[in-house]
Amino acid sequence: MSRIKRFIGSVYSFAADRFYEPIVVNGGFKLFGGNLNDLAIEQGRWAADVAEGGPILDMPVGTAYFTVRLARAHSGLVVGSDIAWGMVARSMEVAEEEAATNLRCVQADAHALPFPDDTFPAVMCTNGLQVIPGLEPTISELARVTKAGGYLFVSVLTLPAPRAVREARRDRLPTIMLSGSDIAAVIERSGLELRTLRSERLATLIEARKPTF
């Protein structure tokens, strides 16, 4: 694991029990994303519908704020994955507190998810891409573990750089400086078919499907 990944994991582990939900989820997400939280929860309900009882992945799981709601809406297994051990620990506590017996959590690198190809009929990536280094390998992994015919649901907050900058340095910019359309293009390059793309203030919500061929 790279130094930057270890640093990010440590920062979010520190935040898990202290201020992640009050400041980030209920503060920043609402300030910059408007109704983003409600829309992300709605995406979770769609994921539960399309999974039809099959397993669902939510990466990154964070403190399970969104994931535990997904687990309540789903009859099958929900797996939360996060690079931050503190987030995983907090998520397991939340699962126990909320009696979400179908929620399991694992610590894992977004670039090397510990699941076989075509595992999940629905994959969630809720409000996390903007802080994960390496958009292309992250999306590639999410696409890999999505089952053929399955769906990837993404919500992400970004502060896009000017178009000229993005066009000139797109491969070098962090995800938070890309536009929703830039992220959608990466998803399409991973082999998924874009179904919907919508904006909510500085947030983008994307739904994509993995072809069955």
Name each model feature, range by range:
Residues E136-A148:
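A short glycine-rich, Lys/Arg-flanked "PGG" loop and its adjoining helix->strand segment in the class I
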Residues L192-F213:
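Core SAM-dependent methyltransferase catalytic element
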Residues P55-A112:
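Class I SAM-dependent methyltransferase SAM/SAH-binding core
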Residues H111-V123:
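A short acidic, Gly/Pro-enriched loop at the edge of an enzyme's catalytic core
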Residues M1-A51, Y65-R69, F153-M177, R201:
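Conserved class I S-adenosyl-L-methionine
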Residues T175-S190:
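Short alpha-helix
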Residues A122-G134:
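A short SAM/SAH-binding and catalytic strip from SAM-dependent methyltransferases
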